[in-house]
């Protein structure tokens, strides 16, 4: 960054913001980079501001009174705030004085008042000087208030971040990540630009008092008629605002529904294409869009009338003020024009400035109170440790993630004493007080000596991680004692990588010891990985380590924990992402050898680890199932140990499956030992038990399937919607939402689930900070999910290893200087994570405007109609001017004869009725035309938005994966959320405002030019200067706004990164370092934002200076060239003052339109995406026994009429080459093989060899070359849809969208309920569906989180059965399955797909043993394609993977001379059918 010119700028340079010229010049000539931005002033640095506010806040906390954050802010910023407020008031006062001078100038043209004619020129100079003074006062004042608001935001940002790092884990479990981000982005952004309006809460009443005093002098009591009208208008506008909020609240749920489905579609776009669901998804989303647009139109119409009422109230304010006075006493021109000028100022103060100021104070105080409450939440307390002890002891420890009994009792007593409840009531209160669940750990005891290894195993959700947290002090024990030295190192279950180099991640603030460092690198098997990087261990890792594999991240996290010299090492399942061989080597070299003299607690599920551990602790449901040595386990729990050891290759299973088996085994043996608990009772689903949500243990850090679901408190939860009552005593603090909470209902995107959003969206679980830290909602609402890699990892179904960006809800952004708070209420959270800088130009091109206007044919005619109506209004205004001109001479004669007044009277009692009848008629006509002329425009622009959304949705669904792979999922979702919301809400009314303001200015210039042609000459250079200045500024401002948005992303990214690694941070004591990083991110954003504010003020000031010069020219031309005729001077000067304010408003609106049109440019960019290659072909009639919906019949040279295709499933692959993107490297090269009908083929290859890619290539989801034929039909001869329907797909990651069971199984509604039930029965899904209320009509939300992964796989299997496909593709379907569901799937595959061709990608040997042939993929090509005997006879990958026991199963008579040439396929021993049926759920 460059040094700021502000530091050396002089007083005038600072006053006129001239120091920004270099950056404006550079931005106009070229694209700005981050290096071009100026450094921030030292006074604005986050370090200084946070230290200042923190000192005052600590002072508040130390005081005996209740601490108030507003007092701390007052002591920091009050005097500067008041200084700029006074400047603002003085600038506003000049607006009240200007009409007085205008009246004197008009009066000087009275023939009877020739004395003042000589001073008219001086009065004109005085009027011009008032404009100059106003400009010099207002702009520094507004900038100063913006600057103070920015400083307040920075200081509170830092205070909140520091507090977040100190919060206890219990508090973190109660705060959703959305609420925390909302606290930062939503509430604090109110200070930045809102602070300039705050002073109007006292300026406006003073101004109204001054103006009414001046109007009283002119019109006496009739002046209050105009004020009364303005007050009524303000109340009407408030009522319209409430009505608009009601419509927006209703619409929020519909938008939410649409975005959830859209998000699920985007995240699972490969599955959508594989299933050929494009049309079904498009229809589903468009139906939701239709309902949403009905409410959008209503809200837009209300806001339109609200806006129009302000523009056209001017007629009636003047009319009602002047009419009573004119009818009783007559009126003169000077009073008319002075009244008009006063009323313009009065109208702005009453209907705009004061309501805005009240709203600003309401929002700001609400935000301050929220932050104040947050800053007083319970902090993490470091436990006191005995540094001399060498052992680790836990004695009868019980702990709750919720508050313990004692804490609740004390809180209850405190609450009752505060409310002065009697003792009897106190006891009653406590007896009814909800104790919020069972303990997470109960009566845990163990003791390990120095240098011993304790292996902790247990069922899913048993409390293993909670045990480690309690040792670290993150979870306070309610009972019992813990003893250890306190020198702890910690390795999290989910590897956490901070932004920085590999070396920095491992050392992590500990002093560097080269020998220890290299030893750790070697023990953690990182040497080979580091050597592959160009920069070695100085390679910079992005946030979350997205450039690393899961195994590399896990090993770096382990190395970090091992490198630290500690007494106790807590290792929470550190080997989850490692392959078997690597895991074994690291366990031996690192855990057993390098750390042999250290005390270690290892969470694991491997028998090998249990055997080598000094002590074993097995947990089940929070209790100790066993504690002792492995030999004691075998002797004391022989059934349990023999059951686990009875599994062949138990340690070879995936971690998920090992945990599943361990959970099932522990559950069975624990139930057998507890006769009081029936097995069936424990199998009941949680939603069948009334009130269980309030009673079930909230083990939120554990697996989400077993942990408690957290629902929003909504009028109708999904359980209640489906006919089930739910516990209604949930704490208000647990009110959770899809997006962060908001106080007002104006949000374009839904602000919370407090709105009844209908069947699709209710009951969505909260993503608490604690859940984020433990990754325990990996299947949460997909609306938050974003992939952060530039190209999605390809497989049959998109990857769902999500990053912190995934959980962020998306609100609309504030893309321009427009008062978006009026429409959107708050900054969109997704603005925290903006899209990549794309090819959108810095200024919207004319081509974009032209395309936008021609999207809908009616739009051009609507614009023409608006202009014609405007011309009618101008003509009506000229009629009024004609009336003025014709009545003035006559009235002057009458007044002279009567001698009733010494002033030139324009309207007398005799002529007033004639004049006012015409005036009222003209005014009513103008009002009717004005109020309704823009309605067709707004209506048509919303229709344009509807068309663009439809085209964009269609383009995304039809786009090839090679194009979609280059886009981020979050970027695509931004188009459907932020940009479509802008097209729906902001753009129509902003375009209307701009056109209206522009026409007002043009009309005023036309009238002035008719009255004084010389003035037209002055307008030409002014308009030219305005156009040039706008173009000059716009190039830079849009780039600065883009850089500012980019600068916002690291702030929130760093916050969430810190939260994900908070336990690690605390264990290593790295909070100060991360506070420094956060301040750097804040300073980077501040530099961009401060420069944007400065350049914006430079532009606003230059615009006003040009208009001041224009007014000076108009004033002197009118004063010097106009002879007799005070009416003409009054009209010219009044309109010139109006032009000055309106044209400036129009300039700002034009900038807003340009900024909002960038959203249109982005939408057009998506609409213009290429589509997948589809070749039409003629179809023939189906055979009599087949339906067209069930099979695809193609007219092809290879297929005879009336044949069903595919009939056998024979598949021939010739020279297949596949790429992810057009310009990328080939992932698969020259693949050729053939599969016989009904054959089962297994794909073999190492991780990353391209097995899943091959399955995607079969479906033409990639860029492919070569040819594939199915039953003689080439894929080049039929359409993509027809080709893909030939395949059934069972992906590893199952796609369950928000909708009913029926919709998920049959989105095209082709099958009857009877057929669906039949298939559900075949795949073992019937009993699952029947237990839900509504059965097939039960609404699944959040990716079907109420279903286990096995049930989801069964759903996928049912889809394939319904599709009647002859070729089945399976991509590791059993990777996350429990043994029961796995057996069901195996049985179904044998029965339902007995005559189908099956292509299986699987890591489990027992599944692969059923394949007849194997395709071995190495180095992007086919290495072998052989039978199983051939592979076993050679040194192949398969031979290395298969164990001797598996070979014995496969070939039981291998040494017999009578064995057949074809292998005997023997199924693994299955559980009895009765057992499967009894334990399926």
Curated annotation (Swiss-Prot):
Biased amino acid composition, Acidic residues: 1471-1481
CDD domains: ABC_6TM_CFTR_D1, ABC_6TM_CFTR_D2, ABCC_CFTR1, ABCC_CFTR2
Region listing for Disordered R region, in residue ranges: 654-831
SMART domains from the UniProt entry: AAA
This protein's record includes keyword Endoplasmic reticulum: yes
Gene Ontology biological process: bicarbonate transport; cellular response to cAMP; cellular response to forskolin; chloride transmembrane transport; intracellular pH elevation; membrane hyperpolarization; multicellular organismal-level water homeostasis; response to endoplasmic reticulum stress
Family named by the database record: Belongs to the ABC transporter superfamily. ABCC family. CFTR transporter (TC 3.A.1.202) subfamily.
Protein name (database record): Cystic fibrosis transmembrane conductance regulator
Source organism of this protein record: Oryctolagus cuniculus
